[in-house]
């Protein structure tokens, strides 16, 4: 062994110790991925002959281990963990894009979602979602301030689900054909006009013939006298199997006066089936209007959707976090703070929602711990130290041989 080989051995094993030490030091770092050196032997050829000369060892590259770390529950809304493929995409103040598995995020003073280094978590905000701007080029820092206020919305749609009881045969003998022979109980629902004023609608049914019903809608509002009739001419017809065969989408309009200030409302009849069994009628009502509300809380779903909960008891999707992945993540360039930057060898980023095909799963209120195996790294440290000591001992031996040769007389 030559002095050059021993020096080479000292340098390489010193680098090996540094790599293992870095792994051990980051055993508790959130989202940290361990690295392993890839060694290769150095071979040279003699200038004067074809003799092959072994010249030591080198490190060709660091192999990054992107296996999953263990998820640790924190019960904190802005702690996120990824299982399998995917990175959080973050943006620094200069607009450079980085990638991380550290899902510990915060809200800054401007209500941006940021990591511990102040980098902005990217995704889509409420405006992009409402306008169906789902292109990757529209990813931007997620900002919740834009969703602080949920503007009032006038009712434009009412959904009505009902199962009615066909009892015409039992009453037909004592009533005229065109008389109302069966009345349902009155059901009410609160709707909203464009000025955020609530109004109560009463809805009831009258059976007027076999497989025919009349739908009655009235306003039960103190501000509008005489229980204003909105419509009284909705006739619902069913076939012999109890399926609705008349129009299932109706327009609610005022019939009597101009007191009403509601926007046009569409009444949708969903799954409206008539049953002849002796069951109780079942009616469900819902509508899409509400008064204004302020954001009081939000939660992040497993697909990255951010759901805002407002003081008016409404819930709205106000943003979405998207993940990035790479064909060759081992070639990402490590940066300070458990982040990586893309390289030519890593390939271009591919963006998608958590849980989509090829993308990992997102777990809220969890953090991914370091994937460092301490037992393995401590063994590697012992091996690296032994190798270093062996190279140092070889260096001493070479040094003594050289001194002996120099001192020969």
From Swiss-Prot:
Disulfide bonds: none annotated. One of its GO terms (biological process) is bacterial-type flagellum-dependent swarming motility. SUPFAM superfamilies: Flagellar hook protein flgE. It is found in: Bacterial flagellum basal body. The keyword Endoplasmic reticulum does not apply. InterPro entries: Falgellar_hook_FlgE_sf, Flagellar_basal_body_rod_CS, Flagellar_FlgE/F/G, Flg_bb/hook_C_dom, FlgE/F/G-like, FlgE_D2, LlgE_F_G-like_D1. GO terms for cellular component: bacterial-type flagellum basal body; bacterial-type flagellum hook; cytosol. It holds the Pfam family LlgE_F_G_D1. This is Flagellar hook protein FlgE.
């Amino acid at each position: 062994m030559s002095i050059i080989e021993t020096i080479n051995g000292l340098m390489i094993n010193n680098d090996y110790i540094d790599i293992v030490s870095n792994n051990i030091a980051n055993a508790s770092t959130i989202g940290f991925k361990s690295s392993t050196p890839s060694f290769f032997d150095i071979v040279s050829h003699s200038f004067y002959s074809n003799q092959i000369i072994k010249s030591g060892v080198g490190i060709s590259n660091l192999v990054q281990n992107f296996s999953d770390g263990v998820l640790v529950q924190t019960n904190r809304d802005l702690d996120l963990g990824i299982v399998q493929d995917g990175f959080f995409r973050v943006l620094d103040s200069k607009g450079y894009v980085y990638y991380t598995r550290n899902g510990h995020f915060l809200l800054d003073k401007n209500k941006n979602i940021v990591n511990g280094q102040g980098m902005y978590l990217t995704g889509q905000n409420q405006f992009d979602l409402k306008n169906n701007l789902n292109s990757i080029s529209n990813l931007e820092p997620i900002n919740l301030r834009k969703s602080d206020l949920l503007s009032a919305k006038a009712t434009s749609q009412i959904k009505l689900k009902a199962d009615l009881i066909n009892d015409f045969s039992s009453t037909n003998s004592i009533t005229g054909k065109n008389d109302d022979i069966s009345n349902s109980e009155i059901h009410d629902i609160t709707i909203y006009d464009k000025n955020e004023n609530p109004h109560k609608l009463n809805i009831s049914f009258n059976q007027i013939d076999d497989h025919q019903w009349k739908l009655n809608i009235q306003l039960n509002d103190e501000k509008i006298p005489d229980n204003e009739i909105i419509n009284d001419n909705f006739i619902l017809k069913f076939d012999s199997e109890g399926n609705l065969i008349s129009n299932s989408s109706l327009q609610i309009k005022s019939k009597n006066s101009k007191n009403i200030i509601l926007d046009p409302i569409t009444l949708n009849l969903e799954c409206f089936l008539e049953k002849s069994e002796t069951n109780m009628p079942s009616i469900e009502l819902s509508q899409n209007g509400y008064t204004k509300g302020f954001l009081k809380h939000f939660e992040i779903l497993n697909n990255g959707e951010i759901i805002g909960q407002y003081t008016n008891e409404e819930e709205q999707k106000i943003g979405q976090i998207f993940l990035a992945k790479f064909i060759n993540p081992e070639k990402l360039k490590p940066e300070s703070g458990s982040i990586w930057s893309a390289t030519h060898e890593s390939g271009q980023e591919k963006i998608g929602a958590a849980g989509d095909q090829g993308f990992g799963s997102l777990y809220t209120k969890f953090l991914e711990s370091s994937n460092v195996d301490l037992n393995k790294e401590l063994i590697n440290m012992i091996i690296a130290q032994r190798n270093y000591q062996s190279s140092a001992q070889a260096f001493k031996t070479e040094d003594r041989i050289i001194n002996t040769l120099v001192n020969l007389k």
